[in-house]
Amino acid sequence: KAVGLAEVIGDHPAISLKGISKEFPWPGARCGWMEFYNREASEEFAKLCQTLENAKMIEVCATILPQLAIPKIMSHPHYFRYREDANVKIGQRSDWMRELLGSIPGIKFNPTQGAFYNTVVFDEKLLTATQSLPITNSQLKDLVESWVEDPGIPLDKRFVYYLLASEQICVVPISSFCSDLRGFRVTLLEENEAQFKDTFSRLGAAITRYLNS
């Protein structure tokens, strides 16, 4: 169960960064906001909040459709029930992910707490610049090999390319988020149980094959 910061913060100053891509969830809806709690608790914190607001006003512009949708969606009488049901379903998928990937050597991840995505991190000692997955389509194979021959390519990005071409599973390398870790992000949005389990079973098998290649 996800717990809102406002429920536990008490009288301490805090900032919660929100976005409807995760709040609803509505992936790709680039509209976020900041919630300040106990803004006047200290002069320094109040100045920080004002600085963030000033920076936001001159640098950030959210897409218009999500902005217009917020009041209609969040004020709908069924919204909170929908969110409760969605969290239960996402929690179930998180359990399936743990069952299917949790015992695979060479990776680690934490159970989600209401998020519709998860991040899998590789043991970097097991990654090399020569690992691969079998690709049956010769054109795809040539294309992927032309991409990964770049000596500067992050090793998690290399895995992502091979996974997409070999298994038609699309994930996002976490090096693309300016992280020093190497791994990938997956979503838990697939609603069909059989499809979800098949995808993550194939993902797990591909991870093992790749690390052992």
Could you say what each language-model-derived stretch is?
Residues 1-213:
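PLP-dependent class I/II
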